[in-house]
Regions:
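Transmembrane helical elements of multi-pass membrane transporters/channels
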Residues: 20-39, 141, 175, 204-208, ...
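Small-residue-rich hydrophobic transmembrane alpha-helices
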Residues: 52-112, 149-168, 276-340, 372-394
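Interfacial/gating helices of multi-pass transporter permease domains
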Residues: 43-63, 95, 130-134, 194-195, ...
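Short runs within selected transmembrane alpha-helices of multi-pass transporters and secretion channels
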Residues: 141-160, 168-179, 197-212, 292-295, ...
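Residue-level hotspots within pore-lining transmembrane alpha-helices
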Residues: 27, 31, 35, 65-69, ...
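Helix-terminus/linker motif at the lipid-water interface of multi-pass membrane proteins
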Residues: 34-53, 122-129, 185-192, 252-286, ...
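Short alpha-helical transmembrane segments in multi-pass integral membrane proteins
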Residues: 1-25, 80-147, 189-245, 302-368, ...
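Membrane-water interface regions at transmembrane-helix termini and the short interhelical loops
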Residues: 155-163, 183-192
């Protein structure tokens, strides 16, 4: 264990040290999830139900494109952390620099593609003539600055790999605070509606995605990563992308499933269904952010010890993580059931019918929290072991296949409540698969 007060990847991790090291990435993910939540709060309460519905209808498309940065960040940080574990710091920094440059280029390309396809995608997602102008307004502003969104995802992962999770937290909190302040001014006071909400989000993403470039631009004491001459290698870029493909799959699947939910809910409940689902997603974002942040925080540790061939520490990390996730899942389920109505009131307290629908749906939907943490961690664990295939399989089954099947079939079997319970069924089936993958890989990796 390091004699320094700073926790290092090479340390042995007790439960306390593990929680201390992952606290920053957990809070980072929570603040990242706050962007859309804050937009939704001000838009719903200040611009009305139509604007709120439009935001929730088009956001899955924007999120789907932005998650490319998450793919490069998670897959790339696992690769870089493993390289650090092997003792090749120079190569690790050249790989990091290449991934940063690649993210800028890919972000610019997908901004253009995203803008070109915005209208047809909005129509495909079910935008009515009443909703379409609002969808286009919000989407155009965010997609124009998509690169900043992707860079923010990238640097979240690399601050952890650089053993600077608290600094990553600082940038994320600064970005979140910027978003909240600007939303209150542009939407709440100035009354700019969706345009104000989108502008606030873009500026905050620049704080979280562009400002870190200046930090990494020079070598700093105590920071293991810095921007230097990139190692341009399509092979290494492909490896990073394939390693992070599960995170890409997760986000794309969530976006596609969100769109499918919206289409089904429009049929079952009309615009109120989409608005109710939007509130559920906001609550789900925060709770999932805890699991995602924890998984992001532990991933570089797992990658480092995998690179160093330290099987005892891999066993320790897996065992302690399972216990932490179990306790967190029970706490989340209990709190979400007790706070369902107060949470719904924050967003839709102005409409009694919509409030009742949202509260009922939330109490069913939130059962999934006791299961989802294991699946999120399982996928991230295999990413950290540089096994993108298994990680992607878990993500594909959990976030796409099982959810699509459940969304389409459960309402036919048990009625309208099936739409809210679809995610519970999907997580339960995915947990069986995740457990199977963990058992199957025990001899190869030595973590059991």
């Amino acid at each position: 264990m390091s004699k320094s007060n700073q926790i290092q990847l090479s340390d042995h991790f007790t439960t306390g040290r593990l929680l201390k090291f992952t606290a920053s990435p957990i809070i980072m993910m929570i603040f990242t999830s706050i962007y859309t939540i804050v937009d939704g709060f001000f838009v719903s309460n200040c611009a009305g139900k139509t604007a709120f519905t439009a935001l929730n209808l088009i956001y899955p498309y924007i999120q789907m494109l932005g998650c490319l940065g998450f793919m490069i960040g998670t897959g790339g940080s696992a690769l870089v952390a493993m390289t650090l574990g092997m003792g090749d710091e120079k190569r690790a920094n050249r790989l990091f620099s290449m991934l940063a440059v690649a993210t800028v280029g890919i972000g610019a390309i997908f901004s253009v593609i995203g803008l070109a396809l915005l209208r047809p995608v909005a129509l495909l997602l079910g935008a009515t003539p009443e909703l379409l102008p609002s969808c286009l307004l919000y989407g155009r502003i965010l997609l124009t600055f998509q690169t900043a969104f992707m860079l923010q995802y990238l640097f979240q992962s690399f601050f952890i790999a650089a053993e600077k999770p608290k600094l990553g937290l600082f940038f994320t909190v600064a970005a979140g605070a910027t978003n909240m302040v600007l939303d209150s001014v542009l939407v709440g006071v100035a009354g700019f509606g969706l345009a104000g909400a989108a502008s606030a989000t873009v500026i905050s993403q620049m704080v979280g995605g562009v400002a870190p470039i200046f930090y990494f631009a020079k070598r700093r004491p105590g920071c293991r990563l810095y921007l230097t001459k990139p190692l341009f290698s399509l092979r290494e870029l492909f490896k990073a992308c394939t390693n992070g493909i599960s995170e890409l799959m997760t986000n794309i699947s969530m976006s596609l499933v969100g769109a499918l939910y919206n289409m089904q809910l429009l049929k079952l409940f009309g615009a109120d269904g989409v608005a109710a689902y939007g509130v559920l997603m906001y609550v789900g974002f925060v709770f999932a952010a805890v699991f995602i942040g924890y998984s992001q925080g532990t991933a570089p540790i797992v990658s480092y010890h995998f690179g160093a061939d330290n099987k005892d520490e891999l066993k320790n990390l897996l065992r302690k993580s399972a216990g932490i996730i179990a306790v967190a899942g029970v706490a989340m389920l209990t709190s979400s059931e007790l706070l369902a109505e107060p949470l719904a009131k924050i967003f839709v307290g102005y409409d009694a019918g919509l409030l009742a629908l949202t509260t009922h749906g939330m109490k069913l939907y939130c059962i999934s929290f006791i299961l989802s943490g294991f699946n999120i961690f399982g996928s991230a664990f295999f990413t950290a072991l540089n096994n993108g295939t298994v990680s992607a399989a878990i993500s594909f089954l959990r976030t796409l296949l099982f959810q699509v099947v459940s969304i389409l079939t459960l309402p036919l079997i048990i009625g309208v409540d099936g739409i809210w319970l679809a995610v519970v069924a999907a997580e339960a089936m995915a947990l069986v698969c995740t457990g199977g993958f963990v058992v199957r890989g025990r001899k190869r990796y030595g973590y059991l």
